[in-house]
Amino acid sequence: MKNILKLLSLSILASLLFVVGCKKEEPVPVTTGTLKGTITDIISASALADVLVIVFDANTNSPTGASVYSGVDGVYSVELDPGAYFVKAAKQGYEKSPPPTVSPISFDVSLGVETVKDIEMFESTVTNGGWITGRVMAGDIAVAGALIVADNAGDGYSTISDEEGNYTIFNVPAATYAVNAWLAGYNSTEVSASVTASTETAGADIAMTEGASGSVTGAITFLATGNIEVDVALTHPSTGETIPGLSTITASSVYELTNVPDGMYLARASYNNDGIVMDPDWIIKNGEPFVTVSGGVIDRPFSVTNSIEVLTPSNVASSVEAVVVATTIPTFEWTPYSSTSDYVIEVTDANGKLIWGGFTARFASKNVVIPSGSTSVAFGDLSVGNPPVENLVSGKTYRWRVYASKNNNATGGWNLISVSEDQRGLFIVE
């Protein structure tokens, strides 16, 4: 009997062990989503390896982590908390994506979902470029999200420091540069970097100190338009990029930017696509709105007006994604602007180089003149003025703007009364 009970006990114990052993493990909860994409050459469609990718939180404009690089298949992948993000990509021999003066497009990453964001890049026009690397520190603390600019006589090349403070500036022409870091609340020491072609200039480490205390304030005057609240920012004069942390929205048509580092800036109002632009005649009369800060408070007012609406080719107002055109001779179209005597069109590349139209230095004269009865013109139309500086090139990104001019008794016999938005008219030639 004892043997039977013993066998029953062993059988029950074995059954319990079997049940416990077969119990499924609790699934690990999913806490992130995946951002993934393939980076390719925009012309050949071939995969690009070793592309530096920095992911930014769209709400704070700060990097989310260390830099990542694309693999030999051009693929990059990052695990992220659910939220809104944007990316910037750079590689030696290729232009940055997006270009420095174009705002990136944000997107959402959802829990447990793979978000695909492919990137196309075109070859750099810099033929003798090297690259600069370094780290940005404030004492023993890495400084993330600082704008790093290498400047030589007004020619600037830039990048953003990642979460570990590391940075790389690609495609820097051979020369000697002054390298600084820019971030609200911090002042930077300057380092020198001598660049040679196809070579890394390493160790350009930058020390920053907290305590930047300058302020820039001002009021917005609205001309020929109703009052709305607009964005105001301080940008780097060499690259046109907004200094991280130095942008705001007006309140009752007044703005204030605090914690401004010492240095010179180009102030900018109403850069967003909101139907409002800085008054071009105000800029001609007063000059570009530069401000030099060395602690203290600087007053910088602005005048703004209604913008001219561009039609085609152009990105939509809600996006800065350039549209693709299938010709190197596109026709530009816009809506008429009241009280205009004539229009001036201006076509620039992604780096701000004038390709066609625009004005001579300091708006002294117009390179093209389009009669007020016309609201379209083909690229390079010789009947309206000077020929293009160069032809449009397949695979490159361009921006076109149109100015409204009015005849009057002012010096030169005319003044500008409006212009199209900074972030409209973006297109890529197929």
Put a short name on every predicted segment:
Residues M1-V20:
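Sec-dependent bacterial lipoprotein signal peptides
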Residues V20-E430:
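Long luminal/extracellular ectodomains of secretory-pathway precursor proteins
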